[in-house]
Structure formats: C-alpha cells, structure tokens
From Swiss-Prot:
<dbReference type="InterPro" id="IPR018468">
    <property type="entry name" value="SFR1/Mei5"/>
</dbReference>
<keyword id="KW-0539">Nucleus</keyword>
<dbReference type="Pfam" id="PF10376">
    <property type="entry name" value="Mei5"/>
</dbReference>
<comment type="subunit">
    <text>Forms a ternary complex with DMC1 and SAE3.</text>
</comment>
<dbReference type="GO" id="GO:0000707">
    <property type="term" value="P:meiotic DNA recombinase assembly"/>
</dbReference>
<keyword id="KW-0749">Sporulation</keyword>
<dbReference type="GO" id="GO:0000228">
    <property type="term" value="C:nuclear chromosome"/>
</dbReference>
<dbReference type="GO" id="GO:0030435">
    <property type="term" value="P:sporulation resulting in formation of a cellular spore"/>
</dbReference>
<dbReference type="GO" id="GO:0005634">
    <property type="term" value="C:nucleus"/>
</dbReference>
<comment type="function">
    <text>Involved in meiotic DNA-break repair. Required for the recruitment of DCM1 to meiosis recombination hot spots.</text>
</comment>
<keyword id="KW-0234">DNA repair</keyword>
<dbReference type="GO" id="GO:0032798">
    <property type="term" value="C:Swi5-Sfr1 complex"/>
</dbReference>
<dbReference type="GO" id="GO:0007131">
    <property type="term" value="P:reciprocal meiotic recombination"/>
</dbReference>
<comment type="similarity">
    <text>Belongs to the SFR1/MEI5 family.</text>
</comment>
<dbReference type="GO" id="GO:0000794">
    <property type="term" value="C:condensed nuclear chromosome"/>
</dbReference>
<keyword id="KW-0227">DNA damage</keyword>
<keyword id="KW-0469">Meiosis</keyword>
C-alpha cells in the first residue's frame, strides 16, 4: 500500500511537471511574440517622416476644402432662390425690368426714326453712315501709316543706319503696307455688304438693340 501511494505520488508529480512544462513553454512563446510586436512598433515610430510632403498635402487638402465650402454656399443660395416665394419675386422683378426697357427703347426708337426720316429715309441714312466709316478707315490706315513712316525717316536713329539697314527697313514697311491694304479692302467689303443687306429693310427695334449693344432676346423673348 505504501508502495502504491509512492507510485501514485510519483505519477502525479510527473503529470504536474509535464503540465508546468507546457505552461512555461506557452508563456515563453507568448512573451517572445509580444516582444517581437513591440520591437516592430518601435521601428515604425523611428521611421523618418517627410515634412515637406506633409505640408504640400496639407495645402492641397485645405484648398479642396475651401472650394467645397464655396460650392456648398452656392448650392445653399441656389436652394433659397429656388424656393417658391423667391421664384415669384424674381419673375415679378424680371417682368418689371422688361416693361421699363420696352418703354425706354420705344421712346429711343421713335426719336431715331424721326431723325432718319429727316435725313431722307433709312437707305440714305445708312449710306451716309457707311461713307463716314469708309473715310475714317482709310484715314486711319493710309494717313496714319504714312505719318509714322515720315516720322521714322526724319529721326536721328534712322539717319544713323547704313544703306543696307535702311533698305531692309523700307522692305519691311512695304510688306506691312500691303497687309494693311488687304485689311482695308476686307473692311470696306464688310461695309458694302451692310448696305446690300439693308435693301428693302427699315430701321427697327432689333437693329436699335444691336447698336446699343443690348440683348434683344432678353428684353423681347420669343
């Protein structure tokens, strides 16, 4: 019996030692893993950060945020305008504005037609106007360029040039005169086309708006 108890104690001791060995081994392994994770985290903390890249990224994000805030404000204002009361108010304001514009333009048109009739009618008025534009165009291109050439030739700088340089300059001026002559002819053709297209037409509200640089369709919607 005594020997049996010793055997049991011995066996029990063997079991406990085996369990303790497993527990100690597991604990040691866990501690090792924990140590490795902590070591990796320390390495990550020690990685150098590029402050310049962070600053650039911060500026870009700040700019995007500002634009988004502006867009949000615009959308909020649009929502307010699109509310039912605002739409009605805006329509009333538009109609009032159109009524005032129509009245003012009608007065200007009547006054202009009286002057045109005194000049012999719309055709005579337009011919005189086109002739005045042609004379102004010819003076600006021909006389203006000739005056500039004369001033340059009489200057001290031009006199100091060699004969070769003077010839080169005159050649360049002749080319410029040819280009200006082409432009003058093109502009004169446009003026002649205006006269041709006006045949059988009268001075009306649409032409008045064009001359006043107003959008006819805004005041007189179809």
């Amino acid at each position: 019996m005594h020997n049996q108890e010793e055997w049991l104690d011995k066996d029990k001791t063997l079991v406990n030692e085996e369990e303790n060995t497993c527990i100690n081994h597991s604990y040691t392994k866990k501690d090792t893993n924990n140590y490795r994770v902590g070591k990796s985290g320390i390495k990550d903390l020690k990685k150098p950060t590029n402050q310049k890249e962070i600053a650039i990224k911060n500026r870009e994000l700040t700019k995007q945020l500002t634009l988004l805030r502006q867009e949000n404000n615009h959308l909020q204002q649009a929502c307010k305008i699109l509310s039912e009361n605002k739409i009605i108010e805006n329509r009333k304001s538009i109609e009032k504005w159109r009524t005032i514009c129509e009245m003012e333009l009608s007065f200007i048109l009547n006054s202009t037609l009286i002057k045109i009739n005194r000049m012999g009618g719309y055709k005579d008025f337009l011919e005189k106007e086109m002739e005045a534009k042609k004379r102004r165009l010819e003076y600006q291109i021909d006389n203006g360029m000739e005056d500039q050439i004369c001033e340059i030739k009489e200057s001290d700088d031009f006199r100091q040039l060699s004969e070769v340089e003077k010839q080169e300059w005159e050649s360049q001026m002749n080319e410029q005169l040819k280009e200006l002559e082409k432009k003058k002819i093109a502009e004169l053709e446009k003026l002649n086309k205006v006269l041709h297209d006006s045949e059988g037409k009268d001075f009306g509200m649409a032409e008045l708006c064009t001359r006043l640089k107003l959008d006819y369709s805004l005041i007189f919607p179809q």
